[in-house]
């Protein structure tokens, strides 16, 4: 059963569902990454969570994300430590 600890935040007037993933996410194909994000989005909505899913992962001592264009600058200034400190919900199915 998939199980994720997430940070459900409201930033810049938007609900954001930040999902920390394993570093192996970086090595998935673009298609597999999109499928994972879509699945997480459907499951988050099904759990009653409003917002857009943004996956984040650590690689080489740095955090990476796949975020909508307007949020990219926000995520450039966020660390994985900060994300983990803001974990406030769990998503599982």
Predicted regions and their residues:
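Active-site metal-binding core of divalent-cation-utilizing nuclease and nuclease-like domains
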Residues: 1-7
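Short, aliphatic-rich beta-strand segments
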Residues: 16-21
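Short, non-transmembrane amphipathic alpha-helical segments
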Residues: 25-49
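Short, intrinsically disordered/low-complexity patches at protein termini
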Residues: 41-42, 51-52, 87-90
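A generic structural motif
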Residues: 47-58
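Polar/charged, Gly/Pro-rich intrinsically disordered segments
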Residues: 56-93
């Amino acid at each position: 059963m998939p199980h994720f600890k997430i940070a459900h935040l409201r930033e810049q007037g938007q609900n954001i569902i930040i999902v920390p993933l394993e570093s192996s996410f970086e090595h998935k194909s673009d298609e597999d990454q999109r499928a994972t994000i879509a699945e997480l989005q459907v499951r988050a909505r099904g759990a009653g969570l409003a917002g857009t899913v943004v996956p984040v992962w650590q690689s080489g001592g740095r955090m990476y994300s796949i975020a909508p264009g307007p949020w990219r600058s926000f995520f450039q200034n966020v660390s994985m430590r900060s994300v983990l400190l803001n974990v406030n919900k769990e998503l599982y199915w």
